[in-house]
From Swiss-Prot:
This is Phospho-N-acetylmuramoyl-pentapeptide-transferase. The lineage of its organism: Bacteria, Pseudomonadati, Bacteroidota, Bacteroidia, Bacteroidales. Keywords: Cell cycle, Cell division, Cell inner membrane, Cell membrane, Cell shape, Cell wall biogenesis/degradation, Magnesium, Membrane, Metal-binding, Peptidoglycan synthesis, Transferase, Transmembrane, Transmembrane helix. The gene is mraY. GO terms for biological process: cell division; cell wall macromolecule biosynthetic process; cell wall organization; peptidoglycan biosynthetic process; regulation of cell shape. Belongs to the glycosyltransferase 4 family. MraY subfamily.
């Protein structure tokens, strides 16, 4: 909203109004404003949660030995993150930009889904929360909306990067002058760092392009669901999900910025995405909101984000990566979320195999995997064998959290580096 006001003032030659025309200025304003909202207003909101007794309820020490110490800590703090994202974006962003619109829809959509889950847990005293199938329906629905919008909207275009080889000279990367609707996505080790989904269904002949878009929509749904659930599982220790997501967000911000700048896109040999500069405003608000929230969520946590926050930030990361055509970098960048997901899936699969044989068995002492590193064998179900018992030394949750942050930083660096691998 302020963007349009200052654009009007700039036309009237109002001093300083032209600053709002610079993406870098609005991005810095977004991160500062989001940080202030989440840290200053966040404190007041936490006190309100305490007053209304919107807190973690009693946990069963047998099924959740680590949760018993968290009883009484305010939950649903994800509202702080959501508000701190929305306000800067509404004030500083171009609200007619299709990418900004999609990100705002994602924030509200998954925020509402997570809020419903937390509401049922806290106010209805149902520890299971929203039924799993409704969560999946919500995530799939969002993935479908995002995928179809990117397919159908005339504003969603790219300019393809083209490698020009001249004998005796270094390869030069140029971008086409025409805006294209494309099913291409960025992936290292492929020609021009691009993979076209339509090429994967080339056997369909003249229908390959349409089939490529169909495949893209399916992948969009899968990525949104997987990353959203991964972030949800990662939110098991104080500061864990917020810290990891801020690091991932910063990396996505770099990728969005270089994708929106034709010279940087040429240097990295990636596609140029007109209009994606508005995503830099959004992701800066996202980072600022998470850092401000981390002020209260770091160990010992004064507030938990709940599913209101974790489902939302996971979905934001997924949709953002899809919009900038970097979704196939997610397994690297969001490696921590991927491992959290896989640990739970493998644990259940291994348990079911043992159950068929009449044997109690586990792959890990406890999942998601971050809990494995702080769980002693004495907390494992009696008579149950565990495949992987290492490490013998147990770690405090703050040490595990920081180490997971370090792993995410390394994965973020690898993600950026892969773009220069030929």
């Amino acid at each position: 909203m302020l963007y349009y006001l200052f654009e009007w003032l700039h036309k009237l030659n109002f001093p300083g109004a032209g600053m709002f025309g610079y993406t870098s200025f609005r991005a810095l304003m977004a991160v500062i404003l989001a940080l202030l909202i989440s840290s200053i207003w966040g404190d007041k909101f936490i006190n309100l949660l305490k007053k209304k007794q919107i807190t973690e309820t009693q946990r069963d020490a047998k099924t959740d030995p680590f949760g018993v110490n968290k009883v009484g800590v305010p939950s649903m703090g994800g509202v702080i993150i959501i508000v701190a994202i929305l306000i800067p974006c509404l004030l500083l962003g171009k609200l007619d930009n299709i990418y900004m619109i999609l990100m705002l829809i994602t924030t509200v959509w998954l925020g509402s889904l997570g809020f419903a889950d937390d509401y049922i847990k806290i106010f209805k005293k149902d520890k299971e929360g929203l039924h799993g199938k409704f969560k999946i329906i919500g995530q799939v629905g969002l993935g479908l909306i995002v995928g179809l919008t990117l397919y159908l909207s005339p504003d969603v275009v790219i300019r393809e990067n083209i490698e020009v080889h001249t004998p005796g000279q270094e390869m030069e990367v140029i971008h086409g002058t025409n805006d294209l609707k494309s099913t291409q996505t960025t992936i290292p080790f492929f020609k021009s760092n691009n993979l076209d989904y339509a090429d994967l269904v080339g056997f369909m002949g003249e229908h390959a392009q349409t089939a490529g878009w169909f495949l893209f929509v399916i992948i969009t749904i899968f990525v949104v669901t997987a990353v959203s659930n991964g972030a949800n599982l990662n939110d098991g220790m104080d500061g864990m999900a917020a810290g990891n997501s801020a690091i991932i967000g910063a990396t996505l911000g770099i990728l969005a910025y270089v994708s929106s700048h034709i010279e940087f896109a040429s240097y990295l040999n990636i596609m140029y995405i007109p209009g994606s500069e508005e995503l830099v405003i959004y992701i800066c608000a996202f980072i600022g909101a998470l850092i401000g929230f981390l002020w209260y969520n770091a160990y010992p946590a004064q507030v938990f984000m709940g599913d209101t926050g974790s489902l939302t930030i996971g979905g934001i990361i997924a949709v953002f990566a899809i919009i900038i055509h970097k979704e196939l970098l997610i397994p690297i960048l969001c490696g921590v979320f991927l491992v959290e997901n896989l640990s739970v899936i493998l644990q259940r699969f291994y348990y079911k195999i043992g159950k068929r044989k009449g044997v109690k068995q586990r792959l890990f002492k406890r999942t998601p995997i971050h809990d494995h590193f702080r769980t002693s064998m004495s907390l494992v179900e009696p008579g149950c064998t565990v495949k992987f018992t290492k490490p013998d030394q147990l770690f405090h949750e703050s040490k595990i959290t920081v180490r997971f942050w370090i792993v995410t930083i390394v994965l973020a660096a690898i993600t950026i580096i892969t773009l220069k691998i030929r």
